[in-house]
């Protein structure tokens, strides 16, 4: 985490500071060892990863879906956005000589709560919505506001507020998000074609047709870039190629828009590195 202190006092009753952090999402299976995707291995589920969330994590997840999937066209220039957690995170703040100190069990727990919520939301989003192909984590920032509080053992109560989600530096390639319009045009055209081809088919037949559609158009090729770990190539490249992760995410995208319940999972096979 990086910190930038900025003291703003009014008769020493309020002290404010700025803080920041970074998370790697489970969007790329190879990254999942460093992410919180294991949060979703704790129980059985019958719905999306996002359906397992609640509180602050669910609120941020819903924003990610709204901003990067539903309203993606509004985020082609910048993918940064401000947000607030509905469940306010507070802690017993340590203030010495008019300056907020980043220490104490209460503060450490509060910052962990922030990161856990952002991590869980990002992981669930990246697995549920691979159509946001460019996304693989984010920087985030927020302000800490400390006020005098007689009920706090330290004499001050700290609150986290004014959050900013800033994923640009974690994209699979520079400014990849700017290609979301072309990507989604490709998705919708392919879905329309598949819907026409699968009229009258049962679900099993539709799934087989989606599988064949992808395999007939894509070459398995690993060029050691993050691009081939996404579905981007199928919808953006003249000569589509990716690794198994790209195949899985393409299947997930088609199933989503064709009304077929589907989930991406990651793991290892015969001692290989993580994959989807």
Please tell me what each predicted stretch does.
Residues 1-202:
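N-terminal accessory/pre-domain segments preceding catalytic cores
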Residues 210, 214, 244, 255:
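Conserved hydrophobic/aromatic pocket- or pore-lining residues that grip, position, or stack substrates
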Residues 117, 206, 240, 274-275:
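Generic hydrophobic secondary-structure packing signal
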Residues 175-237:
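Secondary-structure boundary elements
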Residues 178, 238-242, 266, 271:
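Alpha-helix capping and helix-loop boundary segments enriched in small/acidic/polar residues
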Residues 246-276:
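Hydrophobic/aromatic-rich core segments of domains that either
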Residues 203-206, 243, 247, 251:
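Hydrophobic (often cysteine-bearing) scaffold residues that line and stabilize catalytic clefts
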Residues 233-247:
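A short, highly charged nucleic-acid-interacting micro-segment common to nuclease
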């Amino acid at each position: 985490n990086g910190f930038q202190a900025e003291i703003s006092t009014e008769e020493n009753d309020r002290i404010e500071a700025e803080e920041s952090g970074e998370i790697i999402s489970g969007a790329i299976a190879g990254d999942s060892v460093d992410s919180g995707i294991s949060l979703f291995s704790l129980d059985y589920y019958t719905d999306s990863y996002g359906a397992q969330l609640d509180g602050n994590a669910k609120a941020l997840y819903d924003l990610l879906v709204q901003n990067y999937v539903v309203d993606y066209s509004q985020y082609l220039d910048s993918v940064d956005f401000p947000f607030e957690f509905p469940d306010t995170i507070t802690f017993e703040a340590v203030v010495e000589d008019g300056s907020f100190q980043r220490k104490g069990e209460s503060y450490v727990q509060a910052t962990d709560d922030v990161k856990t919520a952002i991590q869980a939301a990002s992981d669930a989003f990246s697995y549920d919505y691979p159509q946001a192909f460019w996304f693989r984590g984010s920087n985030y920032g927020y302000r800490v506001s400390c006020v005098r509080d007689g009920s706090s053992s330290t004499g001050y109560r700290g609150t986290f507020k004014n959050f900013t989600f800033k994923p640009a530096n974690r994209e699979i390639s520079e400014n990849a998000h700017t290609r979301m319009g072309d990507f989604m045009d490709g998705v919708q055209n392919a879905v329309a074609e598949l819907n026409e081809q699968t009229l009258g088919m049962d679900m099993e037949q539709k799934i087989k047709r989606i599988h064949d559609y992808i395999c007939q158009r894509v070459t398995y090729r690993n060029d050691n870039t993050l691009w081939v770990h996404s579905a981007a190539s199928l919808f953006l490249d003249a000569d589509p190629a990716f690794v198994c992760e790209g195949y899985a995410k393409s299947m997930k995208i088609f199933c989503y828009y064709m009304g077929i319940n589907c989930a991406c999972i990651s793991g290892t096979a015969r001692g290989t590195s993580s994959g989807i």
